[in-house]
A protein has these predicted regions:
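C-terminal catalytic domains of large/alpha subunits in multi-subunit enzymes
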Residues: 1-201
Length: 201
């Protein structure tokens, strides 16, 4: 092998190659709003339970149950880990990751000291994840699997909605609050106070 590499080097023959994957059968007509923009879809469902202190805006994520479609799993442990990671990343996006700029337009929340991402202690006390069974990808993918890196990110909306409904409890669920993301304790408390004022008016 070393002789072959040496000879290729001397003769200036490249021993590596580069290529790009092009997803087949996707197209989109922007003018008509029709087409097939994705090769396949991944589906998931999540239900989350929170406890919200309506006097402080602080909350605890008690429980989340997730069912996710990964097609035919290649490795159940890896798929579950990807779902956990995507979900918790999404929880951070919707509950703690806040962007602030100074008067000159410079980002102030640019480091771990100012940009708050979830910790291990922010995971739900109970986190149940199940993979949808008997649902191979109808497309001819590797062993009929589906990508599972990014799709679970959106399952965190269940936490945001649980917090929104918990805030609505102060007015006996009579209205759906206009809760802004991220649902920090401060934003939750402001939302709760606004709901109370509207209810008293």
């Amino acid at each position: 092998f070393s002789e072959l590499v040496s000879l290729a080097y001397k003769e200036r023959v490249q021993l590596s190659a580069l290529g790009f994957y092009k997803t087949p059968n996707i197209h989109w007509d922007r003018a008509k709003g029709k087409g097939e923009p994705f090769y396949y879809f991944s589906y998931g469902a999540a239900v989350s339970e929170v406890s919200l202190d309506t006097l402080t805006g602080e909350y605890v994520l008690n429980r989340t149950d997730i069912l996710h479609d990964v097609g035919q799993t290649l490795n159940e442990s890896i798929d579950i880990g990807q779902i956990e990671g995507g979900f918790i990343q999404g929880v951070g996006w919707l509950t703690s990751e806040e962007l602030f700029w100074d008067d000159c337009g410079r980002l102030k929340t640019h480091a771990p000291s100012t940009y708050k991402i979830p910790l291990a202690s922010d995971t739900p006390e109970t986190l149940n994840i199940s993979l949808l069974q008997n649902s191979p990808n109808p497309r001819p993918t590797v062993k009929r699997s589906k990508a599972v890196g990014e799709p679970p990110f959106m399952l965190s909306i269940s936490v945001f909605e649980a917090l929104s409904m918990a805030a609505s409890s102060v007015v006996d669920y009579s209205t759906c609050p206009n809760l802004s993301a991220p649902a920090t304790p401060e934003n939750l408390l402001l939302t709760i106070e606004k709901l109370k004022r509207q209810n008293d008016a």
